[in-house]
């Protein structure tokens, strides 16, 4: 397939805001796509180069892209920067610069194919070591030289930075795959969650139909998105949600880890499907020693502890471990870790996700052999009595944990799904995980830092982010400096002192209450919002929904707050 055909679809998708129209366009396109190119086409349509599970990276930053656009279009870098400030998108800037170039030196090479674009990206990703940055840029310049139109340049650049303005988000793509190949949305979504690969899901749907999708199962060394929990306001609500009886587990203030074991080979993945194996060597050792299964996938919580007291220490210390790929031994001594597996997704060659929790828990306790305190199954209690669950809740909080998880004993494990089969009860007032969508430059002593951050929830109906307020409290100077460096590459536009950013940085925010407000696009505002922590472990898809915001608002209208912070 020619790349210009895909470009034409991108442009058609940009021309409409209707989800139904987008779905129909994509479905028709996928039906005509060659089977061998379908995985790449689907992945490109979502704005990615590689599937979610794939660890490869292009590694070309925005500043390098500005230089590349300047080089290939013979426009000064300052002109490219000014265009970028105006357009807020490097793909659009590339198109604008190529249009100017076309008037002078533009030529017409042969049409490039989707396969050639993909293979060039794969070559860039393979480049590593000394001089790799220059080599990557040279390869990309060669690809851009083959662009036959400014639009093609636009989308090559957009794919390189994985920020395509097509609106073909995962939900739309799942709908389109089902519509194109006669499968239900549930079948497509389940297959997607089990493969972590929409392209592969589409290929199977086209070649094997609904039956092929149903046959897909989880497999070791291919991470899947974790099952997610909803918030509830009390233990009573948790019991009512679970039908009167539930398994309550301690809710640790740690990092979610998905552990894959095949023989002595162990891989550790974050909830964002990032490979953390090299950063956490002691966890690998714990698993090899204590998990008595030849092949297993475990869902777990990794907790940092005080080396003197053995008590849990704040979540941010775990992030120090997760980010560090050098001097691992040094941080290992500074922030020792313990592991609390709480679910099993695969055991001895068989998927366990369709078993009820009560059976999965039994398997977990059989295969995870407690080794002192460093690895043991998460502390759990099965009860129908609110008082007993409350005792465990209080013990959990006194131990330095966040509260409790409540789980339906009959529930299967549903990757990537947030539902009421698993809920969390926390000891503090409500917090929200929100995406930063804009920021403001500071002044005076903080000039050069981004110091105030507009945060937003996700409207699940439209796929858009709706703003809830601006957070400026709770940041140390070090955090502001770090946040500025994180956000700079994500800037998409500037308006005086305000910068718009791609919604990729997630923060946990606490607040006094939610109020109606005409100021923000959501129609609501957080009163006295304050940073709790940066959630590097969360992906943009895990931002709290606007439905969650409205649930909190409605609860706040009906109930008061008890002394321990739980809703009555």
UniProtKB/Swiss-Prot annotation:
Entry keyword Acyltransferase: no
EC number: 6.5.1.1
Top-level taxon of origin: Archaea
UniProt cross-references to PROSITE patterns, sorted A to Z: DNA_LIGASE_A3 (PS50160)
Keyword tRNA processing: no
Keywords linked to the UniProt accession: ATP-binding, Cell cycle, Cell division, DNA damage, DNA recombination, DNA repair, DNA replication, Ligase, Magnesium, Metal-binding, Nucleotide-binding
Cofactor dependence: Mg(2+)
Task of the protein: DNA ligase that seals nicks in double-stranded DNA during DNA replication, DNA recombination and DNA repair.
Protein's UniProt name: DNA ligase
